[in-house]
Regions:
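Basic, nucleic-acid-interacting segments
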Residues: 1-231
């Protein structure tokens, strides 16, 4: 970690203090994760400008979730306790290709220090936000070549949702509070999804005409977006 910090022009702390993060989902058999701050306030120079490296931490990995069913969760312990170098940047990247470039540069730095690399060993979380939008975290991105496309699609999604929001406001749209029971009405439906449901409820989306089917990103509609929240 000290070598990594130097390669990222960081200020190394005078003393390393081990902290405990409580873990309550069972992925750490001790009930907590050991972590500590190694360095702060670094930077990388990229073709798109300087990117600030806020912090470099050292922590231990958790167990890997295998399956959850019938109220029980199974974990694999093969990576439990493995040291992790956690690198955090500030929000100074403004182009999808810059995100990929920074990820590549970080990978090269880690490679030079013999840190284990490759799919499954390096996990990157992307925090994406735009003007008028919300910050969205996409966890566990592993493929460098997909990174710019992931950022592009999330920006596309947020821009589409902002446009829909403005249109709904212009229409004075609203979601009516009353919940309707459709079990009897749809008793003879041919829809397999509705047939398999224990019960069918509905609400009136006043002013949403024509927007539910609007695409917010390839393969995802506004209706899919609403369904994700409902689930």
């Amino acid at each position: 970690c000290i070598t990594i910090a130097c390669l990222m022009n960081m200020h190394i702390v005078d003393e390393f203090h081990t902290m405990r993060k409580q873990v309550i989902d069972g992925s750490n058999t001790g009930g907590f994760q050991r972590t500590g701050m190694v360095a702060t306030d670094g930077y990388l120079e990229t073709p798109y400008g300087k990117v600030v490296i806020e912090s470099l931490g050292l922590e231990e990995d958790a167990a890997r979730r295998v399956e959850t069913k019938d109220g029980f969760t199974e974990f694999r312990l093969d990576r439990l306790g493995i040291p992790l170098a956690e690198i955090t940047t500030d929000p100074s990247m403004h182009h999808p290709d810059q995100v990929r470039e920074v990820a590549y540069m970080l990978g090269q730095i880690l490679r030079s220090t013999n840190v284990k690399r490759g799919l499954g060993t390096i996990r990157q979380d992307l925090n994406i936000s735009i003007a008028e939008g919300a910050r969205v975290e996409i966890k566990g991105v592993q493929d460098l070549d997909l990174m710019a496309e992931i950022v592009n699609r999330e920006v596309q999604r947020q821009l589409a949702l902002i446009d829909i929001k403005k249109e709904l406001n212009a229409r004075n749209a609203e979601v009516l509070d009353e919940i309707h029971d459709l079990d009897e009405l749809l008793e003879d439906t041919e829809s397999k999804i509705l047939k398999s449901a224990e019960t069918i409820k509905a609400v009136v989306l006043k002013g949403y005409d024509g927007l539910i089917d609007r695409e917010v990103q390839p393969g995802r509609r506004f209706g899919t977006e609403i369904a994700s929240y409902a689930k």
